Amino acid sequence: MKKITIIAFFLALFANMTFAAEVNVFSARHYDSDIQLYEKFTAKTGIKVNVVSGKDKALQKRITEEGADSKADIYITADAGRLGAFDAKGMFQNSMTSAIKAAVPKNFRSTNWTGIAKRARIMYYSPERVKVNELNGMTYEGLADPKWKGRIVIRKSNNIYNQSLVASLVKNNGKKTTCEWARGVVANMARDSKGNDRAQIL
């Protein structure tokens, strides 16, 4: 089975690979900034970037099924949780270079993958129902406070972003404390979880 490289700073990875005429990027991201990065890479190196876009699960399935015949050189997706899960299947190879290590803080990279962007996990609130002073010093841990009973809506626990949030809390606060926190959040929910982020707001 072909192992592929997930690397956000592929400019650094491929900068000296002038023998490559093109590189195939399988991407689950959908941002104009990514396209601009590819264009800058091509302008600098002369290497053409072929982008195959799709949903994360579909791209992973395709790469896995194609095995050694996969055309993917680079796989880009959102969230370290997805990267960790795919890495656990042995689908990545060591992609670290001195340039990457110098540019990317250790907590934003692993041996086999590198982050290219950070995402803020923000909380939306209704100004009609929440007083600003209630949010003073607000943290994720604070969502378990009984004062929020019947006032919280959130996506399902099988959502990768929620799973990554919980993983970070386990890392920082420990499993026992995080379990207690999760029970507190569930007790404060206004309804059963459903829908995407937009559905929570509406």
Segments the model singles out, each with a brief description of its role:
Residues 4-14:
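Sec-dependent N-terminal signal peptides
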Residues 15, 46-52, 124, 128, ...:
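Solvent-exposed, well-ordered amphipathic alpha-helical segments
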Residues 20-85:
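Early extracytoplasmic/lumenal segment of secretory-pathway proteins
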